[in-house]
């Protein structure tokens, strides 16, 4: 019975060059457990760092090697019939476009907070949280080149893995924000106000909804069948608010 069988292996700042070591901790029994759905998302850490320029961004060839290595590890951990959804790196220009002229809770505008972080070499993403539009555009180009690697892996390497099928999902944050604004929301609500970098709880809700809609439309088999023990779970534990 898979009741609330959810595992979060998220580590802040995780990038492709280190993810394989993290996946060594995945705890599944390939012989006895039900198939799993793995949401494999590195967000933007392979292009985001505190260094000026692009020299510390992950090259596509290295990215490909490390992702294939990580997927090979997953193939030894997951029960047969599992699914892996590779989530694309974000176009982080939406951060500057949305937040730069807004006021940070501490008083200054976000663009000044970003500049302060850059000056002290502690900016979590020098490439996107930067007044230099050319650098922001180049960081997006680099992120897209890594997303192309994901697409190539799904298209050309799926046959190498016997225990799962793969899909690639590329979330469009600009579209998510526009939809939220059209419904009466404020674009700034989607970004975490304390750092002006990560998604807020609202942003996570929007992404979750979009991801679920993608699964329902494009990768239905990954959702699986309703738990056959749902009635017994309800009888034993009561109404848990939809969980």
Residue spans for each PLM region:
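Conserved SGNH/GDSL esterase-like catalytic core that processes O-acyl groups on lipids
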Residues: 1-72, 233-238
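A compositional signature for long Ser/Thr(±Pro)-rich, low-complexity
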Residues: 1-12, 18-21, 103-124, 183-186, ...
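Loop/turn elements at helix/coil->beta-strand transitions in domains of secreted/extracellular proteins
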Residues: 2-5, 32-38, 78-84, 159-167
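Active-site-proximal beta-strand/loop segments in catalytic clefts of secreted hydrolases
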Residues: 9-14, 40-45, 87-91, 169-174, ...
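Solvent-exposed, polar/charged alpha-helical surfaces in well-ordered, non-transmembrane soluble domains
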Residues: 21-24, 61, 65-72, 76, ...
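Sec-exported extracytoplasmic/periplasmic mature domains
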Residues: 24-28, 43, 72-80, 151, ...
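Serine-dependent acyl-ester chemistry module
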Residues: 46-61, 92-144
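Conserved catalytic region of serine esterases and O-acyltransferases that act on ester linkages
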Residues: 116-243
């Amino acid at each position: 019975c898979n009741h609330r069988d959810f595992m979060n292996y998220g580590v802040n700042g995780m990038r492709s060059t280190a993810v394989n070591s993290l996946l060594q901790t995945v705890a599944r029994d390939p012989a006895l457990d039900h198939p799993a759905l793995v949401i494999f998302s590195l967000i933007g850490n392979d292009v985001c760092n505190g260094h000026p320029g692009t020299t510390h961004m992950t090259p596509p060839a290295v990215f490909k090697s490390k992702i294939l290595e990580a997927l090979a590890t997953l193939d030894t951990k997951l029960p047969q019939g599992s699914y892996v959804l590779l989530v694309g790196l974000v176009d982080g220009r939406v951060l500057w476009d949305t937040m730069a002229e807004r006021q940070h809770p501490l008083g200054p505008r976000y663009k000044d907070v970003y500049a302060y972080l850059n000056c002290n070499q502690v900016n979590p993403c020098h490439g996107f949280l930067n007044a230099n539009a050319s650098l922001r555009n180049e960081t997006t180009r680099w992120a897209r080149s890594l997303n192309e690697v994901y697409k190539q892996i799904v298209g050309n390497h799926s046959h190498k893995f016997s225990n799962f099928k793969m899909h690639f999902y590329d979330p469009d944050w600009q579209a998510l924000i526009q939809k939220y604004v059209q419904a009466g929301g404020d674009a700034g609500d989607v970004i975490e106000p304390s750092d002006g970098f990560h998604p807020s709880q609202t942003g996570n809700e929007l992404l979750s909804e979009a991801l679920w809609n993608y699964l329902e439309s494009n990768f239905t088999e990954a959702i699986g069948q309703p738990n056959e023990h749902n009635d017994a779970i309800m009888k034993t534990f009561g109404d848990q608010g939809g969980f």
